[in-house]
């Protein structure tokens, strides 16, 4: 299997897992308005994936620019950036918690993440909050994260490749 064939295979898995969940207009939050090249590539992959859907992005923003006091219609889906910031290593994770608290009636999808907690009490706090949200889907991008989430969280948990695999292969041939 060539590299391009493997990327195509991973992209197909992403589309099969996520496309059925995004069935309405959406907002995309938690964007990386900071200098982490990997997170910027994930964002580019998310945008490429979303362009293929028949729904409209109503708003996008980072943890620093998103207005979480704004009313969002209940049928609007909230998408949160993927990457490696699920857990207690990065303060930015608190933004996810605020979104989940502020929008209990919206479908929320956390794009593929790596999960890591240094302190068990922080994970227990997240389990308590997130498990109460009836429309939250959390995507893991690696087996370990998937197993941690599946074992501890009561939400829908999916194993989905990193969204950077949705970047068109033609980008690499510039």
PLM regions and their residue ranges:
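Membrane-proximal basic amphipathic "stem/tether" segments
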Residues: 1-22
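Active-site and donor-binding regions of nucleotide-sugar-utilizing enzymes
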Residues: 8-13, 26-148, 152-153, 160-161, ...
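Short, compositionally biased segments
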Residues: 168-169
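Conserved small/polar residues in nucleotide/adenosyl-binding loops
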Residues: 172-173
């Amino acid at each position: 299997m060539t590299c391009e064939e493997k990327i195509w295979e991973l992209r197909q898995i992403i589309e099969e897992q996520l496309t059925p969940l995004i069935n309405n207009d959406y907002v995309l939050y938690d964007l990386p308005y900071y200098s982490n090249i990997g997170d910027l590539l994930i964002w580019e992959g998310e945008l490429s994936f979303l362009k293929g859907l028949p729904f409209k992005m109503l708003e996008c923003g980072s943890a620093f620019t998103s207005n979480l006091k704004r009313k969002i219609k209940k049928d609007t889906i909230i998408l949160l950036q993927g990457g490696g910031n699920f857990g207690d290593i990065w303060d930015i994770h608190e933004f996810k918690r605020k979104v989940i608290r502020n929008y209990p009636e919206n479908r929320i999808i956390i794009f593929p993440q790596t999960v890591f907690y240094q302190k068990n009490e922080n994970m227990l706090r997240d389990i308590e909050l997130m498990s109460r949200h009836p429309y939250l889907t959390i995507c893991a991008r690696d087996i370990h994260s998937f197993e941690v989430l599946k074992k501890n969280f009561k939400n829908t948990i999916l194993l989905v490749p990193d969204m950077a695999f949705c970047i068109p292969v033609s980008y690499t041939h510039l």
